[in-house]
């Protein structure tokens, strides 16, 4: 089958303009641009690696053909990540069960546990354990692990973790072959390279500062829910993405 080549509008051929448009314009108009309604989700607390509780939502259509398991990027939560909710609508409309979750230190998961992100040590296993729990709820294989930006990297870690499932997850009612694969957009494959580029570029520095502000909000949210987990002084000192990692993970 021959597929047409996608050609964006002239003003959106620039990657930065496309990013700004997505953040500033599409985020406000996306619901008017899709014919698919929001699935009826049920809330679920999954148990990830190391026993960490992870908040998620699940929707299962009649006769599902597979399951989409997804999360978002470096900041946000399930309530404001419209890009992920749009994916959920489209997937459900095409007959897929949908599992979306707040990953470690984000959203309602941060309210359940003060556990911080692990830079890939456990996020991949989280994905697989969530898929196994979703299977027990009636979500069928194959399971497709999805995400965008940093969430895409987490999904790829999930695919990697699934390849060694027999060595660490023998108690799970899930077989490696039931993980169909991953589908990611702009995964953050080399964080050092990405951050170095950001802080060297004038526009990039503004974007990095905006992300750092959101990370600081996230850290304060964890502190308010779990006062003993993060020192207020450490949060105050964390004014960059690298600073966030240095101050919070050294605490």
What are the residue ranges of the model-derived segments?
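N-terminal cap/lid segment of alpha/beta-hydrolase-fold proteins
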Residues: 22-63
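Alpha/beta-hydrolase-fold enzymes
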Residues: 144-251
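Short, surface-exposed "cap/lid" segments of acyl-processing enzymes
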Residues: 59-112
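Short helix/loop capping segments that flank catalytic or ligand/cofactor-binding pockets
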Residues: 54-55, 79, 192-194
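Catalytic nucleophile-loop/oxyanion-hole region of alpha/beta-hydrolase
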Residues: 80-81, 90, 106-144
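N-terminal presequences and immediately downstream first alpha-helices
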Residues: 1-32
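Hydrophobic/aromatic beta-strand patches that form the interior of the parallel beta-sheet core
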Residues: 44, 69, 99, 144-146, ...
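Short, hydrophobic alpha-helix immediately C-terminal to the catalytic nucleophile
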Residues: 85, 89, 128, 156-160
């Amino acid at each position: 089958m021959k597929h047409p080549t996608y050609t964006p509008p002239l003003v959106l051929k620039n990657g930065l303009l496309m990013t700004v448009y997505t953040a500033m314009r599409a985020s406000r108009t996306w619901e008017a641009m899709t014919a698919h309604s929001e699935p009826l989700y049920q809330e679920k607390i999954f148990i990830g690696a190391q026993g960490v509780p992870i908040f998620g939502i699940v929707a299962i259509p009649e006769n599902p053909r597979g399951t989409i398991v997804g999360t978002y990027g470096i900041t946000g939560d399930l309530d404001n990540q419209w890009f992920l909710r749009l994916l959920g609508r489209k997937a459900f409309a095409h007959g897929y069960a949908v599992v979306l979750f707040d990953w470690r230190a984000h959203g309602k998961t941060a309210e359940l546990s003060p556990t911080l992100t692990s830079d890939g040590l456990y996020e991949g296993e989280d994905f697989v354990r969530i898929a196994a729990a979703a299977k027990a709820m009636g979500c069928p294989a194959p399971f497709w692990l999805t995400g965008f930006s940093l969430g895409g990297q987490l999904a790829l870690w999930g695919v990697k973790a699934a390849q060694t499932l027999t060595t660490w997850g023998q108690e799970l009612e899930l077989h490696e072959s039931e993980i169909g694969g991953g589908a990611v957009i702009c995964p953050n494959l080399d964080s050092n390279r990405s951050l170095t580029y950001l802080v060297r570029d004038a526009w990039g520095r503004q974007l990095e500062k905006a992300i750092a502000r959101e990370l600081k909000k996230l850290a304060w949210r964890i502190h308010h829910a779990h006062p003993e987990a993060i020192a207020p002084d450490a949060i105050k000192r964390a004014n960059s993405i690298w600073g966030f990692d240095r101050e919070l993970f050294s605490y």
